[in-house]
UniProtKB/Swiss-Prot annotation:
NCBIfam families: folE, PRK09347.1-1, PRK09347.1-3. This is GTP cyclohydrolase 1. Pathway: Cofactor biosynthesis; 7,8-dihydroneopterin triphosphate biosynthesis; 7,8-dihydroneopterin triphosphate from GTP: step 1/1. Keywords: GTP-binding, Hydrolase, Metal-binding, Nucleotide-binding, One-carbon metabolism, Zinc.
Amino acid sequence: MPLSEAAVKVQAALQERGLETPMLPSVFTPEERKDKIEHHMKEILTLMSLDLSDDSLADTPRRIAKMYVDEIFSGLDYANFPKITVIDNKMGFDEMVRVQDISLTSTCEHHLVTIDGTATIAYLPRKKIIGLSKINRIVRFFAQRPQVQERLTQQVLVALQTLLETKDVAVKMDAVHYCVKSRGVMDSTSSTTTTALGGIFKSNPATRAEFLHQSK
């Protein structure tokens, strides 16, 4: 299936800036990927001495394969990029548009465990205005990959800048990393904050302060 114009533009913008997730070209269909993941997951679980003949575990390899391809890693396939509604700013609206407390669930690419957090997005309309739900969908698309939070924040920024045809976009993310919470140092209270600021949000101290203050 050919990619949408929005998906092509966003992918090219990320590649140009060196912000694309490290990926190899896929030579398999989604169903072929599921079959191969299921096969290898059976081997992994067997190596862990789990009895896959037990009815509780028998379908686990297939469940994981479907979850990886259709859900938590679906953002690796630009065919799943959300349908984007961007309209001309005919009303001349020029005040800050802000969407906050966007829920996001991603996966740490170092240990493949959960990143759980929220995002706040703002932009100053110029030529284009985007449907509000599309902002949430763009966050979700890029979260549905193995990620590091710093890259995820930048990817959402560049995607919105590309689609809105303006640099005046700001992104802030706050998240708990289960690679910190459930293993290693096992710190259950810390969280990580990242920001990506463009245009006037980066160059104008008052606009930056307004965004960051309201994001608390």
